[in-house]
Amino acid sequence: MVSKPHGGKLVRRLVAERTRERILSEQKEYPSVKIDHGRAIDLENIAHGVYSPLKGFLTSDDFQSVLDHMRLSDDTPWTIPIVIDIVEKTFDEGDAVLLYYEDIPIARMHVEEIYTYDKREFAQKVFKTTDPNHPGVAKVYSLGKYLVGGEIELLNEVPNPFAKYTLRPVETRVLFKERGWRTIVAFQTRNAPHVGHEYVQKAALTFVDGLFINPVLGKKKKGDYKDEVIIKAYETLFEHYYPKNAATLATVRYEMRYAGPREAIHHAIMRKNFGATHFIVGRDHAGVGDYYGPYEAWDMFENFPDLGITPMFIREAFYCRKCGGMVNAKICPHPKEFHVRISGTKLRKMIMAGEQPPEYMMRPEVYEVIRSFEKPFVE
């Protein structure tokens, strides 16, 4: 069986077309709030149930409960505060406001609460640091004085150049059932696949019916693979190296918080809402720099026996010259001098230099796809 949505019911915060047209015709009558791309994507994820059971941005009770207990105030597991900020009060509690991204009215929000918060507490409890060099902490420090809680209704979506690769939770659940998959393992990625990824995915697929590759599309940093490269590389990998109907790919737009262990739980909840029953938790999952231990995220799952999705902890793969193949530390008896770690950074440098990686690092078909792009990396 595909998993039950988090909280028991898949949230849908969409409005009928007639209602939408009426709201848009009256938009000048509403107070307005400008939002950034990340909040616009959060709105989409709330509206389509990716963040079920959230129906909007957190009120103060839920916000504080997430900080203190990693649960909503009704005790549902939830680890990342999904919030929207304002610099000053230009509307009141009880008002309805329109949220705009680049002059597009994305959603109507019913303001339940406007509240203050402690930025250092937010940073310390979510990211385990108050260091402004941490990108998540820097984001928190840039927020306005107030947070606004309340339910939302989606009016428009941010233009998506990869819409044909996007499936919502209501659609993936139908897809999994049509394929006859009772157990599904999800894999989150922001990279084109190398052989180490393939090893981990196939190790997980051994124990379930289907593999759900769910690339995260969104804000990129210099040197990252472009979104279209990731998608085409996976399509090629599926074509040549995966059993037919054993794997599928759909993208999700999401702004990484880099909250390490807490965000690993959040990622699992998102995939649970897509219908996955299992979730691959990687080494230093959702980490950045040296803020978190390499397997700290694994330990975090022990706090959530009621999460409703099974984590799969698969050790990092490497090539062993003695074994003659991809292995991990649990199954390879040979010393480190025989091991070749597959570094994503090293692979990118090789590709940038026009050097084809050896086949034990990257499938040649995948390399050819990457090479077919004039500029495969973000500049």
Curated annotation (Swiss-Prot):
Pathway: Sulfur metabolism; hydrogen sulfide biosynthesis; sulfite from sulfate: step 1/3. Keywords: ATP-binding, Nucleotide-binding, Nucleotidyltransferase, Transferase. It catalyses: sulfate + ATP + H(+) = adenosine 5'-phosphosulfate + diphosphate. It comes from the Archaea. Its EC number is 2.7.7.4. The keyword Ligase does not apply. SUPFAM superfamilies: Nucleotidylyl transferase, PUA domain-like. One of its GO terms (biological process) is hydrogen sulfide biosynthetic process. One of its GO terms (molecular function) is sulfate adenylyltransferase (ATP) activity. InterPro entries: ATP-Sase_PUA-like_dom (IPR025980), PUA-like_sf (IPR015947), Rossmann-like_a/b/a_fold (IPR014729), SO4_adenylyltransferase_pro (IPR020792), Sulfurylase_cat_dom (IPR024951), Sulphate_adenylyltransferase (IPR002650). Pfam families: ATP-sulfurylase (PF01747), PUA_2 (PF14306). The keyword Nucleotidyltransferase applies. Belongs to the sulfate adenylyltransferase family. PANTHER family: PTHR43509, SULFATE ADENYLYLTRANSFERASE. This is Sulfate adenylyltransferase. The gene is sat.
